[in-house]
């Protein structure tokens, strides 16, 4: 069963301007340590760094929409983090208010799966998030 679907489209140049203006203050407020490390591994190409941050920002927006809250009601930026599963595909790791909200939405006895799709084509980045639940072992 689908619990929530969210999508977001963002102009990468907008993220670049915010990073230029606010720097580490913005990065530390919005992104998890894992997300910052992923972006900084691409430090040889500034466009790739900014694109990496923009896709993750879009994923957070999409996830907040899938949770039905937006960035409010106790759900904050760093409560949602893009992580890569062992095979490489992106997913979301939720903590804090985002995890509490997900637990409220999940029917008892069901297991949650969060599917994430990220893409960019300069100057745009896009993310889709689908939160689903099924009986254990059925996802």
Curated annotation (Swiss-Prot):
Keywords attached to this entry: Cytoplasm, Fatty acid biosynthesis, Fatty acid metabolism, Lipid biosynthesis, Lipid metabolism, Magnesium, Metal-binding, Transferase
GO molecular function, one term: holo-[acyl-carrier-protein] synthase activity
Protein residues bound to Mg(2+): 8, 61
Record's protein name: Holo-[acyl-carrier-protein] synthase
Lineage: Bacteria, Pseudomonadati, Pseudomonadota, Alphaproteobacteria, Hyphomicrobiales
Catalyzed chemical reaction(s): apo-[ACP] + CoA = holo-[ACP] + adenosine 3',5'-bisphosphate + H(+)
EC number(s) stated in the UniProt entry for this protein: 2.7.8.7
Chief subcellular location: cytoplasm
Cofactor (UniProt): Mg(2+)
Gene3D superfamilies noted in UniProt: 4'-phosphopantetheinyl transferase domain (3.90.470.20)
InterPro entries: 4-PPantetheinyl_Trfase_dom, 4-PPantetheinyl_Trfase_dom_sf, ACPS, Ppantetheine-prot_Trfase_dom
Domain of life: Bacteria
Enzyme class: transferase
GO CC annotation: cytoplasm
